[in-house]
């Protein structure tokens, strides 16, 4: 059994590639059902910075290829698109990666806590799809707990802790616009809500929300005391705005170049566009329009680098905490790796004992019921004594995979027996 994770990240994969691999929330249930055809357990984490598929598989190399094939088939892309930047982790490396991720150590914005909500959401969707089993349940809940501990005991989560807060920091280059300008938030999800909070905290009060689902726009607007307009008013709302934050889950372009050209015509002040969606909401051609300044997720990287440098010492402290939590998980994992073999070993011994007892009792029909019970009890005791030391050795967290392989070979236990035992309740 192996834990495998494949993925691409903002650090080494441009948004032009990430947006072709991304899954929106509505696609995830069906995608997870498809993933279960390849693996025993699985989860998909798709955010503006990363697309990752994590799974528990029975065969290491075959599992890697299955996950790559899954991405190719689900996204309709050639593997050559993502192969150069794809990372592949196994077992302990997966656990370390997910624990660091939940602590914000692997984020574009070091220490950001938005990833916690994204992991919880991905976990809930995977649970609902029946894709989460005992291993990923333990890994992901352990990651969330480790991330919380790292944030609680270090200063990694101080200051700018989300892509949204970094975007607001970029807006401060235009203080008059932020204080006196009109802002438009396109979308009504988690990132849209974060955007509202940060815009209001930054001094911007003239804010309008536009969203395809009017009920969600209305609810969000009432919660924060801002205005909202229906989706049909999007272009008019754009023309009336100075700052635009677009963060929908739309599969394609929301603001076309032509729409932005019309909105920018005759303006005397800059039009700031922040595209925080993946796939991107805003046509990249708008960057060529005079007076229009487009920032997508990747364009915010320079500010994030400064953020990481300032928090380097706190990040080291957080890494130490994460390593301790990873070690705890790996002790549990080592034992779990041995459990199917132990069950199969005991079943093998019991099958042999049962066959020999039946043969022996058939030869001794004169034995009384009490004597028969004594013989059966004796055989059980012998089996338990013989298996005790091997089982203790297999349960040792320090036991290697070579020991498991050796035991299977010595007792002629095939993989089918091992995985049948693994699925026993």
UniProtKB/Swiss-Prot annotation:
InterPro entries given in the database record: 4pyrrol_synth_GluRdtase, 4pyrrol_synth_GluRdtase_dimer, 4pyrrol_synth_GluRdtase_N, GluRdtase_CS, GluRdtase_dimer_dom_sf, GluRdtase_N_sf, NAD(P)-bd_dom_sf, Shikm_DH/Glu-tRNA_Rdtase
Binding-site residues, substrate: 47-50, 107, 112-114, 118
Pathway entry: Porphyrin-containing compound metabolism; protoporphyrin-IX biosynthesis; 5-aminolevulinate from L-glutamyl-tRNA(Glu): step 1/2; Porphyrin-containing compound metabolism; chlorophyll biosynthesis
Domain text: Possesses an unusual extended V-shaped dimeric structure with each monomer consisting of three distinct domains arranged along a curved 'spinal' alpha-helix. The N-terminal catalytic domain specifically recognizes the glutamate moiety of the substrate. The second domain is the NADPH-binding domain, and the third C-terminal domain is responsible for dimerization.
One Pfam family matching this protein: GlutR_dimer
HAMAP family, alphabetized: Glu_tRNA_reductase
Site label Important for activity, positions: 97
GO terms of biological process kind: chlorophyll biosynthetic process; protoporphyrinogen IX biosynthetic process from glutamate
Protein name: Glutamyl-tRNA reductase
Described purpose of this protein according to its UniProt entry: Catalyzes the NADPH-dependent reduction of glutamyl-tRNA(Glu) to glutamate 1-semialdehyde (GSA).
PROSITE patterns: GLUTR (PS00747)
Reactions that this protein is recorded to catalyse: (S)-4-amino-5-oxopentanoate + tRNA(Glu) + NADP(+) = L-glutamyl-tRNA(Glu) + NADPH + H(+)
GO molecular function: glutamyl-tRNA reductase activity; NADP binding
Any further remark recorded for this protein: During catalysis, the active site Cys acts as a nucleophile attacking the alpha-carbonyl group of tRNA-bound glutamate with the formation of a thioester intermediate between enzyme and glutamate, and the concomitant release of tRNA(Glu). The thioester intermediate is finally reduced by direct hydride transfer from NADPH, to form the product GSA.
Family that this chain belongs to: Belongs to the glutamyl-tRNA reductase family.
Keyword terms of this UniProt record: Chlorophyll biosynthesis, NADP, Oxidoreductase, Porphyrin biosynthesis
Binding residues annotated for NADP(+), in chain numbering: 187-192
Active-site positions on this chain: 48 (nucleophile)
EC number: 1.2.1.70
Subunit structure: Homodimer.
């Amino acid at each position: 059994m192996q834990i495998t994770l494949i993925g691409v990240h903002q650090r080494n994969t441009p948004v032009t590639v990430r947006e072709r691999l991304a899954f929106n929330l509505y696609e995830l249930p069906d995608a997870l059902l498809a993933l279960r055809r390849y693996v025993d357990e699985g989860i998909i984490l798709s955010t503006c910075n990363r697309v990752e598929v994590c799974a528990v598989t029975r065969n290491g190399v075959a599992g890697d290829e299955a996950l790559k094939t899954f991405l190719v088939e689900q996204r309709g892309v050639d593997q050559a698109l993502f192969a150069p930047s794809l990372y592949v982790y196994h077992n302990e490396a997966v656990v370390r990666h997910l624990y660091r991720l939940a602590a914000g150590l692997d984020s574009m914005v070091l220490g950001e806590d938005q990833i916690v909500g994204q992991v919880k959401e991905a976990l809930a969707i995977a649970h609902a799809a029946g894709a989460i089993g005992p291993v990923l349940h333990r890994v992901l809940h352990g990651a969330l707990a480790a991330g919380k501990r790292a944030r609680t005991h270090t200063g990694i989560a101080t200051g700018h802790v989300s892509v949204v807060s970094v975007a607001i920091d970029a807006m401060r280059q235009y203080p008059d616009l932020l204080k006196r300008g009109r802002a438009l938030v396109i979308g009504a999800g988690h990132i849209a809500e974060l955007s509202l909070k940060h815009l209001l905290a930054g001094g911007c009060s003239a804010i309008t929300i536009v969203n395809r689902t009017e009920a969600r726009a209305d609810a969000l607007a009432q919660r924060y005391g801002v205005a909202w307009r229906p989706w049909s008013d999007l272009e008019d709302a754009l023309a009336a705005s100075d700052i635009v934050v677009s963060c929908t889950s739309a599969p394609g372009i929301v603001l076309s170049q032509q729409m932005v050209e019309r909105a920018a015509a005759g303006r005397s002040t800059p039009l700031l566009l922040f595209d925080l969606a993946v796939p991107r909401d805003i046509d990249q051609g708008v960057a060529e329009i005079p007076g229009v300044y487009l920032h997508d997720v990747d364009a915010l990287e320079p500010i994030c680098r400064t953020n990481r440098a300032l928090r380097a010492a706190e990040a080291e402290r957080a890494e130490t905490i994460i390593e301790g939590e990873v070690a705890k998980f790996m002790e549990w994992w080592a034992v779990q790796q041995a459990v199917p073999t132990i069950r199969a070993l005991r079943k093998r011994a019991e099958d042999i004992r049962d066959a020999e007892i039946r043969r022996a009792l058939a030869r001794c029909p004169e034995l009384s019921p009490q004597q028969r019970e004594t013989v059966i009890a004796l055989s059980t005791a012998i089996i338990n004594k013989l298996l005790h030391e091997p089982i203790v050795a297999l349960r040792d967290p320090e036991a290697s995979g070579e020991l498991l392989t050796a035991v299977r070979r010595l007792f002629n236990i095939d993989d089918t027996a091992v995985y049948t035992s693994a699925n026993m309740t």
